[in-house]
Amino acid sequence: MTAWNQVASNRGAAGVDGVTIQQIVGSGDDETSGLVDFLIELQKELQEKRYQPQPVRRVYIPKADGKLRPLGIPTVKDRVVQAATLLILEPIFEADFLDCSYGFRPERSAHQALEAIRANLAAGYREVYDADLQGYFDSIPHDKLMACLQMRITDRTVLKLIRMWLETPVIEETDEGPKSTRPEQGTPQGGVISPLLANIYLHWFDKCFYFTDGPAHWAKARLVRYADDFVVMARCQSPQLVDWVEKKLEDWLGLKINRNKTRIVNLSKEGTQLDFLGYQFRYDRDRFGHAWRYLNWGPSAKSLNREKAALTAMTASRFGLVPIDRLIAKINRHLKGWMNYFCLGYPYDVFQKIGHHVRSRMIRHLLRRSQRPYRFPEGSTTYRVLADLGLLNPTKVYVNSRRKPKAKVSGNAGCGKSARPV
C-alpha cells in the first residue's frame, strides 16, 4: 500500500495501456474496491511469477537548450512494482553511498551539494573540473549495472525483475505509427527505480575516487556529485587527475564524456565562473578593492533568463480572461517555489530583476485586459496597485527572510532537476 500511495501522489500520466490512477481507483463498486482488486491481482501475479512488465511509452520534453529529452512512462502497474522494489533496495544501498553524492537520495538535496561546493571553494579548492556526461541515463551498460547490483543483492527474483525493466521494449509514436524498440543499454528516465539505479552505477566512480589509491589522496581532490552532474575540485588540476577521471568514466564504466561541455575552471582567474545546478560561483573584488577575495554566488544568468521566460509565458495575452486574483495566485505559487530554490548565496540583485520583470509584465497584462485603457487609482502607483492585488515582491520577501534566518517562503516549492532546476 505504501508503494501505491507513492505512485498515486505523483499523479503520473498513463502508460501504453492508457490506464490512469483515477480509473483504477474508480473501477470498483465503491471508491476503494477497484484499488483493492488491482492490488490483490498484482500480488498474485508476483507470487505466482506471472508478472511481466509492459512496454514503456516514450515521450519527449523540451530542455532549456531547445533540445528534447526522452522520457519513459511505465504503466501504473509497473510503477507500483518498481516503487515496492525501491522501498526494499534503497535502505540497502543508502548504507553504501558516500557523502559526496547528493542527488535522488533521502535527506539529501541540491542545496547541500551547492553548500559543499561553497565550502570547498572557501577551503582553497578553486580549480574545478566541470564534467558533462552525454546521455547518462540512456547509456548505462546493462551487464555492468547488473554486476554492480549482484554485489549487494542475492535474491534472483529481484535481479530478474530489474533485468526485465531494463530490457522492456520502448514504444514511440512516429509519423508511420507506433514504433517498438528493445534498448540494449540505459535505464529510462521516468521509471520509479531509474534514479536509484543511476546512483548505484556512479557509486563505483565515487568509491574509486576516495579509495586509498584514488585522486582524493594523491591529488588532494574533492568530488561533489548530484546524480550525473558532478565537479572535481582541487587546489591544482593536473593532467594526471583529468586523465584518471576520463579513463574511469569512459574505459571502466563505459560512459561518454561530452568534450564540448566539459571544461576546467580556475576560479582564481579574473572573469571565470562555475555554473552548477542553476547557480553561478565567481570571485569578485571585496569592498576594499582587493582582487578575487569575495565569493559571489547565486542564481546564474541562464536561470534568470529562464525564469523571465516562464513569467512572460504566464502573463501572455491568452490569459486575459483569467480572473486577476487567480492569475496572481498562480504567479505567486510559481515565484515561491523559484525563490525557495534560489535563496542561497547572494540572490538579491537577481530577485530585484525578477521583481521588476513580473511587475512590468503584470502592468502590460492589466492594460490589455479590456478595450478600455486600465486606469490606476488617483494618487496611487503601479507598485502599490500590484501590491494591493497581492502580487509577491521577491526582494521584500528576501529581505524579510534574512532578518529571520530560519524563515522560509511559504507554499509549495517546486524547482527543478527536481528539487533541481529544470
Placement of each model-derived feature along the sequence:
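Core structural elements
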Residues: 53-59, 64, 166, 170-172, ...
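Short, solvent-exposed helix-loop connector elements
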Residues: 181-187, 296, 312-327, 338-350, ...
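Conserved polymerase palm-domain catalytic core
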Residues: 38-41, 45-59, 64, 96-268
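Surface-exposed loop/turn segments and immediately adjacent short secondary-structure elements
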Residues: 1-48
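A conserved non-catalytic segment of reverse transcriptases
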Residues: 163-167, 171-172, 253-321, 334
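Extended C-terminal regions of large enzymes
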Residues: 359-361, 366-408
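Short hydrophobic/aromatic beta-strand micro-patches
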Residues: 24, 74, 233-235
